[in-house]
Amino acid sequence: GESRSLKKALAEVAEGKAYLLQGGDCAESFAEFHPDNIRDTFKVLLQMSLVLTASASMPVVKVGRIAGQFSKPRSAPTEKKDGKELPSYLGDNINGMEFTEKARVPDAKRLFRAYSQSASTLNLIRAFSQGGFADLRQVHLWNLGFINKKTKGKYKEIEDKISDALSFMEACGITPENNRRLRTVNFYTSHEALLLPFEEAMTRVDSTTGEYHDTSAHFVWIGDRTRQLDGGHVEFCRGIENPMGIKCGPTSKPEEIVKICNVINPKN
């Protein structure tokens, strides 16, 4: 249901009726896993989305690069340091970042830890997004604090506009206490579908539609290094109904991207 809701929201973005805001770490790690870090990422994205909504007068679809973004695509299977060559670091869910032979040995147990961390992160995000932490007035106060301390009024005009809107709604009796939409947000998760065995293990059949969904995230994408038309990543992604993206780099050719889109989404 959540993936379908995101797909509908992204359709609004494609039609120019909404904005997409996606943000988060390049790669999550075990060492930096902490509720405060998750809270801060969530908080910043909420602050940014409020400013975008106020400036453009359009809804903002909020997607975090979080709760599963562990794997790192590498250009080479090995790396050298001080004359020593070791297997490349592939992400905390595969091997360790430390430049030692022991750390660079792939360990399947890391997948269980990554799964557990992702589940905990998602549960905390759901609590933040639905439990009152995302109260519109609170997000506005965060922005006001940022403006007063950091930017010397650079964005004061926008925040004054938000203050006036909140005051008007409150005068009309529309408050977070009696309107759930003012104290909750829809927040979605995303990551690159790089490690196919893990993504396959997380794929389930929707009993109501018979469609396949990758339950490791709401939104997944194919990376610049793995978007070969005859490759496994395109083959996997064409079989799931999640909303998805294709990363396009400097080497991307328009005709190639069109072919990939036709394979992944032949219905459109």
What are these regions (language model features)?
Residues 27-28, 32-268:
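Active-site-facing alpha/beta catalytic cores
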Residues 1-19:
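N-terminal basic/disordered segments at the start of proteins
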